[in-house]
Amino acid sequence: MLTLFHHPFCPHSRFVRLLLSEYGLEADFTEERVWERREAFLMLNPAGQTPVLVVEGYPAIPGASVIAEFLDEMHGSLEDGVTQRQLIGESPQQRIESRRLASWFGDKFYSEVSGPLANERLHKRYMTNEQGGGPPDTDVMRAARRNIRYHLAYIGWLAGQRDWLAGDNL
């Protein structure tokens, strides 16, 4: 049985939900409001961030990249080592580029664009003042909107160079 602790607007959680779907895995989804800092959730992931995947017989698996690696190891190849359903490429070069782009979007894009926008426009609505809630900070939102232009230009450049963002093969 798989249980994913996630938040609907968390891009890292969306990434893991997509991976689960690609592998054909069913999971129970538990919405986690990380700003509430629930003790039971902090026991699963002391960092207090989503996503966290709980798999029977394994310790809690925190973080999108750690979950992606776990799913790839457990469901991406056959027992004889022949690649069957690896989602991040077959060659080392393909896997490096897939991981690099996952890191780009999971870290850089999130910290400069989607994270600030989601926090200011969505999360603050549900937070108390003590949790960091309140009206959106328009300076933060303006900075994120400026940053998105740079990221979209980079995505456009990648799309112009390749058939897919991470390379010429899907």
Predicted regions and their residues:
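Amphipathic alpha-helical packing segments from all-alpha helical-bundle domains
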Residues: D139-A159
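Surface-exposed helix-capping loop/turn segments at secondary-structure junctions
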Residues: S77, W157-D168
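Short amphipathic alpha-helix initiation/capping segments at coil-to-helix junctions
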Residues: I148, D168-N169
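GST-like domain detector, emphasizing the conserved glutathione-binding G-site
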Residues: M1-R142, L165
